[in-house]
Amino acid sequence: MNRFIDRVVLHLAAGDGGNGCVSVHREKFKPLGGPDGGNGGHGGDIILEVSPQVHTLLDFHYHPHVKAPRGANGAGDNRSGARGEDLILEVPAGTVVLNSKGETLADLTTVGMKFIAAAGGQGGLGNAALASRARKAPGFALNGEPGEQHDLILELKSMADVGLVGFPSAGKSSLISVMSAAKPKIGDYPFTTLQPNLGVVEVGHQTFIMADVPGLIPGASEGKGLGLDFLRHIERTSVLVHVVDTASMDPGRDPISDIEALEAELAAYQSALDEDTGLGDLDKRPRVVVLNKADVPEALELAEFLKGDIEQQFGWPVFIVSAVAQRGLDPLKYKLLEIVQQARKKRPKEKLAESVIIKPKPVDGRRRREEFEIRKDPDNPGGFLVVGEKPERWILQTDFENDEAVGYLADRLAKLGVEDKLRKAGAQTGSEVTIGGVTFEWEPMTSAVDTAASPRGTDIRLEKNERISAAERKRASQVRRGLIDEFDYGDGEEASRERWEG
């Protein structure tokens, strides 16, 4: 028998974006072919999709770690990398997606509804896409962004029309087994039912879904017994059925006190709910009372004696049944179908399935200077933190082994206004500035126009000294005259220094 799993924690890692390519077009008789490096492919997304063939979260219980494929790197001749294949995870209808803080992100109630649980990283731009008037043939490309990585909680709330509630051993499992094709475990001891059971009840040509949850006891809304874990399965039900054991011999218990105790637990659970199901609060939903075990003579006598009192006190319809003898079930079925049909008419019409997407907020150029802030670094006296989505993404895209790429990053940060704000915040040349996970020694940069003469892959602004030293001029002259070999530095300390400077 398959286990019913209604809560799991998923560890998700979407695919990383592919890196852009650095390439220069080479063709006969075309000496200035220009850059032709392609862009990297988008990383694969992780998507949750509601499937009618799935009824539990069991698969995720055994395989909670999920990783999507990465995008392919770009290539020369303007060839973009392939997009990483999206990974689709099928979930049952009624799945609620929460983040690690317990905040609801999506409620998947309709077959075919999709939710992008983790977005893949954007592919990096190739040098062809980075060409500009200042950089006609960039010698660098952008790295792909990493895919989103986080944990999500999936909770399953049954999409049943009728919910059976009652004390342990009240006969709920027996009742659902004779009213539907469900085959729950049945025993003559408390808490036989350890997981919710669902069954489809047929009434003529009409059907409705019934849910049997584990028995509730006083304090269930506070975590006692098994009730707290399974009360979520009655949140979406249109009608609640109190199944009362009229044959119970427990001291201090009677049908009316059982109903009052269960109503108190439902009211306490309702106060913790913040979801609008369109059905109203639990305390306002229709109720039906089922006095069970009428096959026992004493129980039948007690049920007939209390039936009028219960109807008068609570105002709910009361049915006397025997699940074992299968007596009194048809009137109960028709009454439940009538209430369910009325509730379905009142329920708001479901919208067409829509994809709910978790992704970085769109960038609005008009708010460019409001998209980051400068803070004092609490762990580094005299240091500064640049906090913002856009600069942190740029850090991830930068290849720090390439000076030209670093210079491009500096230009982007300056254009965003980071340098101006750092200067106003008191940053000085040499101050340590941290963006994302990278720390720099801040030095104000000149305009990107000055880099036009830089060889590919370099940025003259990053050189320690733009002037050629006397030793370098002397050595270049000796090489031209053939007095020394270009790679012959000789021996000794002076030669070592010249080798390092050259």
UniProtKB/Swiss-Prot annotation:
Binding site for GTP: 166-173, 191-195, 212-215, 292-295, 322-324
Record's keyword terms, sorted: Cytoplasm, GTP-binding, Hydrolase, Magnesium, Metal-binding, Nucleotide-binding
SUPFAM superfamilies per record: Obg GTP-binding protein C-terminal domain, Obg GTP-binding protein N-terminal domain, P-loop containing nucleoside triphosphate hydrolases
Name of a matching Pfam family: DUF1967
GO biological process terms, semicolon-separated: ribosome biogenesis
Keyword Iron-sulfur on entry: no
Cysteines engaged in disulfide bonds, as pairs: none
InterPro entries: G_OBG (IPR031167), GTP-bd (IPR006073), GTP-bd_Obg/CgtA (IPR014100), GTP-bd_prot_GTP1/OBG_C_sf (IPR036346), GTP1-OBG_CS (IPR006074), GTP1_OBG_dom (IPR006169), GTP1_OBG_dom_sf (IPR036726), OBG_GTPase (IPR045086)
Enzyme Commission code: 3.6.5.-
Residue ranges of every copy of the OCT domain listed in the record: 364-444
Transmembrane segments annotated in the record for this chain: none
Cofactors, names only: Mg(2+)
UniProt domain Obg: residue ranges: 2-159
GO molecular function: GTP binding; GTPase activity; magnesium ion binding
Binding site residues for Mg(2+): S173, T193
Keyword Metal-binding: yes
Entry GO terms, CC: cytoplasm
Subcellular location: Cytoplasm
Main EC class the enzyme belongs to: hydrolase
Family listed: Belongs to the TRAFAC class OBG-HflX-like GTPase superfamily. OBG GTPase family.
Oligomeric form and interacting partners: Monomer.
The protein's role, per its UniProt record: An essential GTPase which binds GTP, GDP and possibly (p)ppGpp with moderate affinity, with high nucleotide exchange rates and a fairly low GTP hydrolysis rate. Plays a role in control of the cell cycle, stress response, ribosome biogenesis and in those bacteria that undergo differentiation, in morphogenesis control.
Annotated protein name in UniProt: GTPase Obg
Source organism of this protein record: Corynebacterium efficiens (strain DSM 44549 / YS-314 / AJ 12310 / JCM 11189 / NBRC 100395)
